[in-house]
Amino acid sequence: MSAQTMLIGNRPCRIYGEAHAEYLLFQMTGEHELQSMDDEVAAIAQSNRKYLFAAIPAESWNDALSPWEAPAVWGKQGFGGNAADTLRFLTEQVIPTLEQQYPLPENVKIILGGYSLAGLFALWASTQANLFCGIAAASPSVWFPGWMEFEQRHPMQAQRVYLSLGDKEEHTKNAVMAAVGDNI
């Protein structure tokens, strides 16, 4: 299925799927993920469910997807803690725009997914909004400083949560990131 690019809040969002969807799927993306997006959507299409999928670019990966500020754990770039702004963009601009452009049933099931820091964002967003029926977090950055303490005090509101972890993440030489295996 080919993508349609829709400008939402000056961001070029890639939209796949159809109106009257049973599922409304969102994924915050970085440049590194766009090349594999068509394959991901092809796998989703095999479910034979009606869906509308929006790939939403994160303007600054470390800043836009981190729930609070934190120092760099590798390299020099820290984390800006702007996840609340990203969630607000999703709920106040992206969802209303898609509802305006595509007729969707009132009971459409909304699922938020992401990989790495976008996976952490999806988990965090589920603690902030009772909007998502499901969360899909692939190799989420649950090593993020303070995440485990936060998660214990703020339960997720999604009905379903999918977590996966690759073979290499917990074996990295970076001690902070290696905690992902214990934290997932």
Regions found by a protein language model. Name each.
Residues 113-118, 122:
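Gly/Ala-rich beta-loop-alpha elbow adjacent to hydrolase catalytic centers
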Residues 9-12, 20-103:
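Serine-hydrolase catalytic machinery in alpha/beta-hydrolase-like enzymes
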Residues 124-134:
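Conserved hydrolase catalytic core segment
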Residues 105-108:
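Short helix-loop-beta connector
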